């Protein structure tokens, strides 16, 4: 069996798309090989400057085969038959026929001779290279090819021989290059093992997962050597593994003066902006050290550490300056600055948004002074120097500035947490933060819907789906007894609008279904879904349990029977007991009347238990009473009884949706 080695050597490939390219090229090459009946074991490796494919167990030749090509019907016009023959360069006598669905068709049996694999590989390799679609690609020079970054070399060998492959201006060879530290020394290779060995000798670790494992192990070793801890950050490890061909973990020091900064500022400066790893002592306090991944084994690692310490100190010096500037002013002093910041061109400034949020909070809990104060100040940090430099710290800096002003913890936490949850995995805020989060998200939703920014199938630029799901989660997980319907009305009034309410309610219902869909059947969700979200999970569990019992199943069948008899008609009038002439209809009416007074939606468990007492009389009614009596008055009276029965079910859930 044979082997193929292909390396696409380029300028720096962004770290965040290397893994996708690895998986994408594996999929494309596998598919194209299979289409050409070449079956092989394929591996793809990615790194900062190369994408490598290694295929083994390749045959040396393709197997001869016959391809059956369907032509026109034997009854088709002669011109169509001649056209088919001409297209395949055969005569009519060379065609065979086959009966398909009582119709005779011409077929051409094309014989494909065996071919040397090395003859067809260049063509399908170029096809595969072109087929992968990068998120963004580029042209360079005057060349007519495009790739994620300028390609500098293509290595392609099949059984130690260079394949005559041409991709744009690049002809394949048997040369690769080591780490930049080796001055891009040319390395001639004969096969995969030779390739891998020479790369390792020249400070290139081919396998992405191996680089990640080296980084992970080295981080723990460095942390332990300083008697410190490090929090696992797989995403950052994956990213720095894509930035380094030969990762070496080094440790730098943080000057003590910077430790007065909030820990989130330190983490953001190091992790997000510098790709550094933070260290903590055994009590989880921030340690005055950081770890970073160097791309290569430098002779003077101290110089590398000093360089990184200098870069971090410069960034933290700026952060400390911004922080001191910010705490010299109050959050309230920033309110006027919000007037100059646009929330949305059709919806005014952030100052106007804050006023609306505050009004919604007053509507929710008019006597809650902490909530109202938090609402007034919740966006003030957006015009701070620190958030201008580190936008990801919005809310967090507001918390620290509120604490610096000696505002109480409840206000500070509400300012910090009102952006939560920021995804399905994020926790929901509690207390005043929960109410403020609802007010903020609801104002955004209502305003942006009015502004015509409703999500579409192709996009949701304002993340309204996430914001509505956030409101739903906050209400459900905090068991908040909020009248969402009236809240939507109030929010619409703040925009002096009464349009789009139905669209907004429909949007809430759609996201609620999404929230529950993995746990409950959609018909069950539809049966209990309304804007009173606080008890919806309890209702779902209770109704699910009820319908799994034998009594519940029988009652549902009885409801459906009653509903089917009634159809879509809405019968006017009230039941007249004087028209009863059977005991079952009298008993069903009496139980229905009694239950209509006892069943209350809020006491759901009790309501379902009471509903079970309907089973015996309704079963007896259907077994012994003819609804469509010959006397029209009696027939109508019995239909009215069934209508009352259905209304009783509807007090508990929309049973017509089950």
UniProtKB/Swiss-Prot annotation:
The residue range of the signal peptide is: none
- Keyword terms of this UniProt record: Aminoacyl-tRNA synthetase, ATP-binding, Cytoplasm, Ligase, Nucleotide-binding, Protein biosynthesis
| PROSITE patterns on file | AA_TRNA_LIGASE_II_GLYAB (PS50861)
Q: Which GO terms describe its cellular component?
A: cytosol
Enzyme Commission numbers on file: 6.1.1.14
Kindly state which reaction or reactions the protein catalyses.
tRNA(Gly) + glycine + ATP = glycyl-tRNA(Gly) + AMP + diphosphate
Query: Which biological process, per GO, is one annotated for this protein?
Result: arginyl-tRNA aminoacylation
Molecular function (GO) terms listed? arginine-tRNA ligase activity; ATP binding; glycine-tRNA ligase activity
Q: Where in the cell is it found?
A: Cytoplasm
Q: InterPro entries annotated for this entry?
A: DALR_anticod-bd (IPR008909), Gly-tRNA-synth_bsu (IPR015944), Gly-tRNA-synth_heterodimer (IPR006194)
Family label = Belongs to the class-II aminoacyl-tRNA synthetase family.
**What subunit structure does UniProt give?**
Tetramer of two alpha and two beta subunits.
Name listed for the protein in its UniProt record = Glycine--tRNA ligase beta subunit
Q: Which gene encodes it?
A: glyS
């Amino acid at each position: 069996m044979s082997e193929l080695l292909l390396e696409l050597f380029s300028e720096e490939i962004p770290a965040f798309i290397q893994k996708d390219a690895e998986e994408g090229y594996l999929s494309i090459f596998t598919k194209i090989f299979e289409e050409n009946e070449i079956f092989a074991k394929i591996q793809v490796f990615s790194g900062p400057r190369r994408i490598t494919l290694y295929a083994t167990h390749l045959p040396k030749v393709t197997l001869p085969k016959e391809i059956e090509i369907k032509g026109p019907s034997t009854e088709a016009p002669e011109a169509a038959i001649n056209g088919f023959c001409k297209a395949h360069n055969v005569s009519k006598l060379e065609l065979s026929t086959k009966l398909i669905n009582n119709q005779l068709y011409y077929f051409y049996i094309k014989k494909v001779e065996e071919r040397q694999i090395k003859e067809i590989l260049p063509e399908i390799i170029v096809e595969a290279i072109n087929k992968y679609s990068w998120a963004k690609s580029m042209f360079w020079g005057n060349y007519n090819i495009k790739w994620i970054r300028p390609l500098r070399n293509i290595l392609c060998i099949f059984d130690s021989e260079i394949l005559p492959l041409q991709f744009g201006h690049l002809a394949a060879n048997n040369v690769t290059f080591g780490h930049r530290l080796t001055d891009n020394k040319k390395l001639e290779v004969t096969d995969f093992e030779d390739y891998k060995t020479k790369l390792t000798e020249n400070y290139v670790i081919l396998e992405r997962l191996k680089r990640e494992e080296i980084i992970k192990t080295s981080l723990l070793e460095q942390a332990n050597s300083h008697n410190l801890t490090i929090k696992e950050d797989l995403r950052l490890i994956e990213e720095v593994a894509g930035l380094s061909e030969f990762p070496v973990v080094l440790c730098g020091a943080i000057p003590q003066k910077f430790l007065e900064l909030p820990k989130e500022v330190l983490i953001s400066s190091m992790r997000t902006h510098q790709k550094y790893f933070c260290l903590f002592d055994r009590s989880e306090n921030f340690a005055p050290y950081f770890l970073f991944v160097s791309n290569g084994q430098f002779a003077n690692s101290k110089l590398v550490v000093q360089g990184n310490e200098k870069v971090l100190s410069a960034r933290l010096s700026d952060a400390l300056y911004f922080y001191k500037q910010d705490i010299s002013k109050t959050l309230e002093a920033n309110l006027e600055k919000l007037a100059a910041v646009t929330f949305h061109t059709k919806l005014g400034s952030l100052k106007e948004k804050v006023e609306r949020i505050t009004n919604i909070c007053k509507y929710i809990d008019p006597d809650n002074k902490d909530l109202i104060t938090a609402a007034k100040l919740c966006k003030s940090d957006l015009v701070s120097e620190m958030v201008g430099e580190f936008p990801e710290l919005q809310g967090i800096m507001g918390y620290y500035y509120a604490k610096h002003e000696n505002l109480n913890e409840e206000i500070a936490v509400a300012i910090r947490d009102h952006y939560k949850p920021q995804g399905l995995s994020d926790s929901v805020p509690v207390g005043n933060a929960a109410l403020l989060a609802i007010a903020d998200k609801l104002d955004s939703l209502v305003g942006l819907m009015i502004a015509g920014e409703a999500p579409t199938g192709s996009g949701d630029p304002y993340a309204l789906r996430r914001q509505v799901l956030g409101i739903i989660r906050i209400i459900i997980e905090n068991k908040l007894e909020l009248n969402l319907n009236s809240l939507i009305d109030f929010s619409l009034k703040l925009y002096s609008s009464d349009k789009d309410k139905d669209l907004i309610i429909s949007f809430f219902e759609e996201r609620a279904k999404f929230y529950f869909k993995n746990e409950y059947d959609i018909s069950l969700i539809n049966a209990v879904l309304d804007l009173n979200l606080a008890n919806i999970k309890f209702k779902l569990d209770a109704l699910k349990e009820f319908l799994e019992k034998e009594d519940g199943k029988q009652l549902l069948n009885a409801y459906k029977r009653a509903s089917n008899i009634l159809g879509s008609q809405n019968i006017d009038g009230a039941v007249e007991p004087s028209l009863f002439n059977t005991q079952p209809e009298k008993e069903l009416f009496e139980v229905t009347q009694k239950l209509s007074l006892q069943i209350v939606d809020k006491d759901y468990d009790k309501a379902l238990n009471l509903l079970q007492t309907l089973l015996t009389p309704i079963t007896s009614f259907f077994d012994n009473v003819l609804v469509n009596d010959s006397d029209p008055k009696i027939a109508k009276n019995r239909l009215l009884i069934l209508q009352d029965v259905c209304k009783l079910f509807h007090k508990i859930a929309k049973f017509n949706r089950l």
